[in-house]
């Protein structure tokens, strides 16, 4: 099995469905004996430029370990899902477990307030 990092940009109208979307992809991975090493909900963020006439999106980060077959199923599902504005999937050498820089800055801001 290989390690991948997935970033999803989800339409802001579906912010209340984020947990269902995460659960859907988590099930796809775990049913096929994959594992999730890191899962972060970055929340709503401003886009650098409008995409499909939207200025904000809800961001999700996942670091997973799964087979190529399951990854292809995930890619196909992402492309058919109208709520996913953009996605980025990168292959990484090792599992990443530590918090991302985005998560660290968000936690630091919460501690300072």
Swiss-Prot record:
Keywords: Ribonucleoprotein, Ribosomal protein, RNA-binding, rRNA-binding. One of its GO terms (molecular function) is small ribosomal subunit rRNA binding. It comes from the Bacteria. The keyword Ribosomal protein applies. GO terms for cellular component: cytosolic small ribosomal subunit. InterPro entries: Ribosomal_bS6, Ribosomal_bS6_CS, Ribosomal_bS6_sf, Ribosomal_S6_plastid/chlpt, Transl_elong_EF1B/ribsomal_bS6. One of its GO terms (biological process) is translation. Gene3D superfamilies: 3.30.70.60. The keyword rRNA-binding applies. Pfam families: Ribosomal_S6. Binds together with bS18 to 16S ribosomal RNA. Belongs to the bacterial ribosomal protein bS6 family. NCBIfam families: S6 (TIGR00166). This is Small ribosomal subunit protein bS6. The lineage of its organism: Bacteria, Pseudomonadati, Pseudomonadota, Gammaproteobacteria, Enterobacterales. The gene is rpsF.
């Amino acid at each position: 099995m290989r390690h991948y990092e997935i970033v999803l940009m989800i339409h802001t109208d579906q912010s209340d469905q984020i947990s269902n979307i995460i659960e859907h992809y988590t099930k796809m991975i775990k049913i096929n004996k994959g594992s999730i090493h890191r899962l972060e909900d970055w929340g709503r963020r401003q886009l650098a430029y409008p995409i499909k006439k939207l200025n904000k999106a809800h961001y999700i980060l996942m670091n997973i370990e799964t087979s190529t077959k399951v990854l292809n199923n995930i890619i196909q599902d992402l492309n058919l899902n109208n709520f996913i504005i953009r996605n980025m999937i990168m292959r990484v050498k090792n599992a990443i477990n530590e918090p991302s820089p985005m998560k660290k800055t968000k936690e630091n801001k919460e501690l300072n307030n």
